[in-house]
Amino acid sequence: MSSREIRIATRQSALALWQAEYVKARLEQAHPGLTVTLLPMTSRGDKLLDAPLAKIGGKGLFVKELETALLEGAADIAVHSMKDVPMDFPEGLGLYTICEREDPRDAFVSNTYASLEQLPAGSVVGTSSLRRQAQLLARRPDLQIRFLRGNVNTRLAKLDAGEYDAIILAAAGLIRLGFESRIRSSISVDDSLPAGGQGAVGIECRTADSDLHALLEPLHHTDTALRVTAERALNKRLNGGCQVPIACYAIREGDQLWLRGLVGQPDGTQLLRAEGRAPLAEAEALGVRVAEDLLEQGAEAILEAVYGEAGHP
């Protein structure tokens, strides 16, 4: 990396490119004269679209190729959706910036119905997420959940083709891509607790690039980072990836963080919940503590069953 050029590794989906362009614009605004270019790449998770995420297995489905570009020197930073970022990083890489969070909620999208409550019994709802599935079926066991993968445009097209009565997507992705009008209703975090890091964008780079860390500093949002740190600590203690029925969401209350966590049976028959509060400086310890509460309630058995069915740890 020259001191006046930064190369961004990014996935090729419309949402990933939006996030990379957002980081590019922020960097160029903060550092006039800086040249920022994009290096679009295809991840393993992007290639394997014919199976649910939980069946594919492994962590880092959407980031490993980008990390390879960093390690080989082909790129200087990688821009990720925080909910896709594994808890541990390859030697020589680290997460140095978390940008301000967009709406973290799940969105109900339908061409016929205004809300989840309005769906008739037997309606077909599309999602690729066991987390969403567990919470949906806990509220509405009369619904049919059908597998849904692909980028945002593909998922909307499948809904429009009549394959589903409704689909559930992250509100942040729809908002960022200009599809906010497709959101019929945003689902309260009380009814659908988000994935850890949902709605936040993270920037990964080489640990040795201290000059680059300084350039990234204006993009870092401390409030978001504290909240996401607690969420990721919970995920790490539960050995969770982006394809397991784990939910967690932290908010700041003055000088405290309030973290809620959930582990659910994919069929919705059991939802384990835990929560806790701690000073801002103890975000990581808070995540571990809430995770321990879930484990004491029996979360490990639920997660082991999911991992066993998927055929991976």
From Swiss-Prot:
Top enzyme category: transferase
Pathway: Porphyrin-containing compound metabolism; protoporphyrin-IX biosynthesis; coproporphyrinogen-III from 5-aminolevulinate: step 2/4
Cofactor(s) essential for the protein: dipyrromethane
GO biological process: heme biosynthetic process; protoporphyrinogen IX biosynthetic process
Catalytic activity: 4 porphobilinogen + H2O = hydroxymethylbilane + 4 NH4(+)
InterPro entries the UniProt entry points to: HemC, Porphobilin_deaminase_cofac_BS, Porphobilin_deaminase_N, Porphobilinogen_deaminase_C, Porphobilinogen_deaminase_C_sf
CDD domains named in the record: PBP2_EcHMBS_like (cd13646)
Pfam families for this protein: Porphobil_deam (PF01379), Porphobil_deamC (PF03900)
Keyword field contains Hydrolase: no
Disulphides: none
Cofactor binding comment, as recorded: Binds 1 dipyrromethane group covalently.
Similarity field: Belongs to the HMBS family.
HAMAP family the UniProt entry points to: Porphobil_deam
Name of the protein described by the UniProt record: Porphobilinogen deaminase
